[in-house]
Swiss-Prot record:
Originating species: Saccharomyces cerevisiae (strain ATCC 204508 / S288c)
Domain of life: Eukaryota
Cross-referenced InterPro entries: BAH_dom, BAH_sf, Bromodomain, Bromodomain-like_sf, Bromodomain_CS, Rsc/polybromo, RSC1/2_bromodom, Rsc1/Rsc2_Bromo
A GO MF term: chromatin binding
Gene: RSC1
Entry keyword Nucleus: yes
Protein name, per record: Chromatin structure-remodeling complex subunit RSC1
Organism ancestry: Eukaryota, Fungi, Dikarya, Ascomycota, Saccharomycotina
Biological process (GO), any one: chromatin remodeling
Amino acid sequence: MVEQDNGFLQKLLKTQYDAVFHLKDENGIEIYPIFNVLPPKKEYPDYYIIIRNPISLNTLKKRLPHYTSPQDFVNDFAQIPWNAMTYNAKDSVIYKYAILLESFIKGKIVHNIRKHYPEVTYPSLGRIPEIFAESMQPSDLSSNPINTQENDEKAGLNPEMKMAFAKLDSSITERKPTNQDYRMQQKNSPAFPTHSASITPQPLASPTPVVNYANITSAHPKTHVRRGRPPVIDLPYVLRIKNILKMMRREVDQNNKTLTLCFEKLPDRNEEPTYYSVITDPICLMDIRKKVKSRKYRNFHTFEEDFQLMLTNFKLYYSQDQSNIIRAQLLEKNFNRLVRIELSKPDEDYLPEGELRYPLDDVEINDEKYQIGDWVLLHNPNDINKPIVGQIFRLWSTTDGNKWLNACWYFRPEQTVHRVDRLFYKNEVMKTGQYRDHPIQDIKGKCYVIHFTRFQRGDPSTKVNGPQFVCEFRYNESDKVFNKIRTWKACLPEELRDQDEPTIPVNGRKFFKYPSPIADLLPANATLNDKVPEPTEGAPTAPPLVGAVYLGPKLERDDLGEYSTSDDCPRYIIRPNDPPEEGKIDYETGTIITDTLTTSSMPRVNSSSTIRLPTLKQTKSIPSSNFRSSSNTPLLHQNFNQTSNFLKLENMNNSSHNLLSHPSVPKFQSPSLLEQSSRSKYHSAKKQTQLSSTAPKKPASKSFTLSSMINTLTAHTSKYNFNHIVIEAPGAFVVPVPMEKNIRTIQSTERFSRSNLKNAQNLGNTAINDINTANEQIIWFKGPGVKITERVIDSGNDLVRVPLNRWFCKNKRRKLDYEDIEEDVMEPPNDFSEDMIANIFNPPPSLNLDMDLNLSPSSNNSSNFMDLSTIASGDNDGKECDTAEESEDENEDTEDEHEIEDIPTTSAFGLNSSAEYLAFRLREFNKL
């Protein structure tokens, strides 16, 4: 029975809800679009301060299936017109529509529902507060109205609404009228209402807000306007360009597909390389939009030229494709039509605020030039000793000669509301959603704000003028919460988002965190159940006079080290009362440079990861400097015992250590200088390698080896703990040259020695291209280079370290214990003489190699090898081969002096050489 009643109720309410979409005004225009959705919070922040219970038709639609009482439905429905009349001025179109909707609910909807539920009544939501509209008249914008208790009672204001209005008065929130509002006021007729798909509240400043705002002259400037985003400061021709690009996205072809789809991006160079040989000046719609955003177009004509160039390129390249030609012609036709429409409009249609604002690229104050993207210190009326930190987003001038800027504000810790146990970096600021207009006279000087993620990696390479701040979080003033900024470029002006931020790397940097500067403001009787307090507001043209603190529960996870009461903390943060660490302290930035590992060199781990905290965990009982490996010994202090026959690199050890473990930090070098430096180091390393083959070996330093350095790097770059890694081998080492992408030089492992590179050029373009296109790692050792095709891990077992003559011996035949694989053997180049090959091959002392060799020489080279018939034999004759070998072994002299010495390979330890190279190497040994 209850289910039947609920089904009937929902059906009844759905019928009454649908009826409102047929409601029209006296001119036959439907009014529902005005109340369909709520206004955007960023554009109308004051709406959500005044309206305590915002509801739209869409909100009502979502609640329909959940209503169990018809009275709740009527209460929510009645809230919609009441909110509209509360926020909007009496003479506005929206206010009139709200009265019409209210009458419809009372006369139709409530009447129909009462037929089935007689107890339903229209709710009394109170009187519409009129004092707000009166207090916000333009003549009173410069003064704060004083609302007496008597006036509040007359206006029907409850204490909560009085607080909301007081907060709104202090912020002086101001909304700019739109083009549509301007045309409505000019027409002054109800036949031209707003028909957007969302509620567009009109400002409460006056019944005719557009006219009043437009008439404000330079004698009463609109200073310190609070916005949720930067204002649009464009000349009429720029607005024409934007309108055309916006309308072009709506154009479709005969198949109802977007017409501009083929013009959005340029063809991929790898897929269509011929495009860039045919088209000498490529351009696409994406490039055009970037030019518009970065203000590259100085007039409308240059935009037309670029668009026509794009069409010409398209027609030229696809001249044989009739469908693409038709598409380009259709797009050109629509473009010309839109151009005619936009150019026919007067410039006044693009001036919604009634005044002309000229965008500026830069301004000059006190012999200092400022431009968009600069970080500045602005005048703070609340405290002149703490200027406002901001970034310039817009610069413009007005017809009266005044110059203005729009800046995004960054709050200091003492200007925010936060938990009393929250920690802050030295000179930390938080990004807000406030974009304020200032006269340029408010600029007090320059500063710089660096993103924390970048500051972890190093210092900015550009010169910093003024104080430097660090920013990691975005501060939400409404919810009093801090959110980590993941994408810093999204916080910057569009003109700067494509620019790189060069950074000088700094390793081992850790950050001190400090208690809240306003922690003493916590009330003595504060509890965890207290409401989040509000900041103390001062002047409306400045950040809060002082923030507030409150108690919060202890967090189980604190991935970012935000609170002093948390058990977990990243190791790059040093909290108060943490054990001291050794290093160089920078008191100005609140950082310390240590030799221990930090997460600054580690990949960013998602906050939801379950393995982040165990690897980053730091407690007071265990200093953060003791980053432990699997052996429970600090990694940088482990004593790695090396095998006695490992080569100690005397000449390369110091340079390798400097590059891999503790890189020097230059002030700044251009990419070309860095490349030259890398090349010079490379040639120096090569010369040392050549000298090492003739010079007597000296015992290398035991403090640093390649194994210790590679283990250190592994610990830096991995979030897991690895066992000890050994890479040393006789005659093998890694060249200390930084790996650079797209370097088309011989900086990778090749088949020929670099000392004979000039001779290799005689082989022709094919051999050179084969060398240049190699992408293997830079590995060198005494002897010729080899093409690395497989990397294996050394097991440390002598049984698998097989010398080359394991398969070659004149006095001994041995069966190969692996599967036979046919492979063609390439003859060495004819241009290489035997003397040259002898110079190239300079085998070092005994060298063991851990590898699985799958090779079988071809028949035409079998004369240079031992009898390898056993390699080709199958399983059927395996027993005969074993028997023959056993009989030969019995008659063979086993004295050491009759044994042939092991032939060492020239491959690097832990690397497999190609079968082609090994066959060539064995053949040359046989000639000896």
